[in-house]
């Protein structure tokens, strides 16, 4: 694998990897899409993952809620590719860090509800240092992995295997974190 540094006006290619052969699915469907639309789609993807995080239930004896966040993250990697999928997931994290209620727990949104810094730190520690922190780390790994695999020329029919591996990559850091 050879790493190539290149500049491009039409992409956010800071460091391109030469083995990436295909465009993301969204760019393949809409070849004339601009970066502004891709950025807007990445923001929409973060909103989608935020919405899917709110659809949750708890299994008895398990402190981690069961949500559809993982599905949303897998779709982001598959549709947006590894670069824009990563932008979307990072925007999701930054939204949670500033206090927007995007995570699947009760201690969220403290910055805009209560300006008491101790409450903000408590919410931050609960989300990122608590039992769900490993899942959040796995979201980044899975999005980049799925986007890279799909852009590396895997057949669209074999996408299910990359999604299964992506799910595995979400759960490995989560289990280690617990």
Positions of predicted regions on the chain:
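Small-residue-rich segments of transmembrane alpha-helices in multi-pass membrane proteins
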Residues: 74-79, 165-174
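Alpha-helical membrane segments and adjacent membrane-interface helices in multi-pass membrane proteins
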Residues: 53-144
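Hydrophobic transmembrane alpha-helices
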Residues: 2-90, 98
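Short helix-perturbing small/polar motifs within transmembrane alpha-helices
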Residues: 4, 10-31, 37, 41-44, ...
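C-terminal TM-helix exit segments that contain a strictly Trp-centered aromatic cap at the helix terminus
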Residues: 95, 99-100, 169-178
């Amino acid at each position: 694998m050879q790493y190539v540094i290149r500049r491009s006006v039409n992409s956010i290619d800071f460091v391109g990897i030469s083995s990436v052969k295909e465009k993301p699915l969204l760019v393949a469907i809409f070849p004339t899409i601009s970066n502004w639309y891709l950025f807007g789609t990445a923001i929409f993807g973060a909103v989608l993952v935020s919405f899917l995080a709110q659809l949750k239930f708890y299994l008895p004896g398990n402190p981690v809620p069961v949500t559809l966040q993982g599905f949303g993250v897998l779709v982001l990697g598959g549709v947006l590719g590894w670069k824009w999928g990563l932008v979307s997931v990072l925007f999701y994290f930054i939204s949670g860090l500033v206090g927007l209620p995007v995570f699947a727990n009760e201690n969220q949104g403290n910055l805009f509800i209560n300006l008491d810094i101790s409450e903000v730190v408590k919410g931050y520690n609960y989300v990122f240092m608590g039992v769900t922190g490993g899942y959040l780390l796995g979201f980044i790994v899975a999005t980049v992995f799925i986007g890279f695999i799909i852009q590396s020329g895997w057949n669209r029919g074999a996408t299910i295997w990359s999604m299964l591996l992506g799910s595995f990559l979400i759960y490995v850091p989560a289990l280690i974190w617990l």
